[in-house]
Amino acid sequence: SNKVSIGALDRTLSFDRYSQQILQPMARRAAEKIEASIAALYPAFYWFDGTPGTPPATYAALADAGAIFTDGGNTVSGRMAFHSPAVSAKFAALIQGTYVDGNNKKALEMAKVGRYAGFDNYETVFAPTHTVGTLGGTPLVNGGAQAVTYATAKDTWSQSLITDGWTAAAANRLKAGDVFTIANVFAVNPNTKVSTGRLQTFTVLSDAASDGSGNLTATISPPIIISGAFQTVNAQPADNAALTIKTGSSATAYRQSLLLDPMAIALVSRPLDIPSGEGLKTSTVSGEHVTMSVSSWVDGNTLAENMRFDMLW
């Protein structure tokens, strides 16, 4: 919720742009909160591409990521990419000199990218920054036969992976959002179940610490399922298979771009049950994707009008 208070003197002398001064800023602030909450979901995304520390600023950077989408059975239409302002500026500079009708004009005049390399590209200040765990050692899978079934993993789409070989000291080695591959564990197309030729990337869902002997159990996604309708990989990892961290160097922060399938996230909103009466007036408006309630009341002591803007999502 957001709240604003408007004094009687302001309403009388200087308050002639109600929509511009109150409604639009409050709606924008609510939209930014939603955008930030969506960006904060990034640790659950297990596909990963690119070189940490090198912003994606080429056609190939986006197109290669799109190839991973296609190999993974995702739809070609409706793909979206969300970049930091710095990355968006680099893409705009890349295409402003081209002769694609419309896109180059937007890139030149407004530093906007639009549809490019198979994605609808957007600029956001909420592009997340990921800080890699402290890592350390030579992490290995500890024990074979760690595949799971769909029945055991379907509710969380995750599993525990037992590893060792970390530096022999208790420490928080992996952070939520760290991504890694396992030697000889390849992704499969979900429809054909044929290997894509790409090592499956796994994300860590919660911070994981090693013990004094260098053992660590991580909660990862996707689960390692080697057969059936929901197969995720071509084979389960062998004992002592090596883990390779893809998200960057120890304890280093990197800005991320988020590339999404149109069905990646469901935004669900519904009206709040707000009681009326006792001087409180509430108006609820439902838009295409969200619902906002605006409640107002007057402070009898100060004559200030208080307005509260609420959204549930």
Task: Show which residues each predicted segment covers.
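Acidic/histidine-rich, surface-exposed loop or edge segments in extracytoplasmic proteins
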Residues: 4
